[in-house]
């Protein structure tokens, strides 16, 4: 997807969502473009790579990813660990299946993304 196609596809939903939340639509669009490589690698309708924690009650999609940690004791974080390799710099590369939120629509994703950004921690 080209940047122009990305804008045509996602801008209407991003603009409408931001109108409701007060978030800057340019910020939201930029983050979505960065996270998906201009729409090339979105996980379902998940434009932001939002992972599914234990509290998440919606649908989940498992995707194989690479994660890097300073030790080899992080496997408990993932449903499946395929390999752990010590890198030359001393860090560990994990090949894992990671759980991502699987939204039914782009609007559902944008609503959840806004909620995450606007919730005080």
Predicted features along the sequence, with ranges:
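Catalytic cores of secreted/periplasmic lytic hydrolases that degrade extracellular macromolecules
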Residues: 1-121
């Amino acid at each position: 997807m080209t940047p122009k196609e990305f804008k045509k596809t996602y801008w209407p939903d991003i603009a409408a969502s931001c109108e409701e939340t007060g978030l800057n639509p340019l910020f939201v669009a930029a983050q979505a473009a960065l996270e998906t490589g201009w729409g090339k690698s979105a996980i379902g309708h998940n434009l932001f790579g939002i992972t599914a924690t234990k509290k998440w009650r919606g649908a989940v999609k498992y995707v194989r990813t690479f994660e890097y940690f300073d030790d080899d004791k992080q496997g408990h974080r993932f449903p499946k660990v395929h390999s752990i390799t010590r890198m030359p710099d001393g860090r560990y590369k994990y090949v894992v299946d990671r759980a991502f939120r699987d939204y039914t629509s782009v609007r559902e994703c944008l609503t959840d993304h806004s909620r995450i950004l606007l919730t005080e921690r």
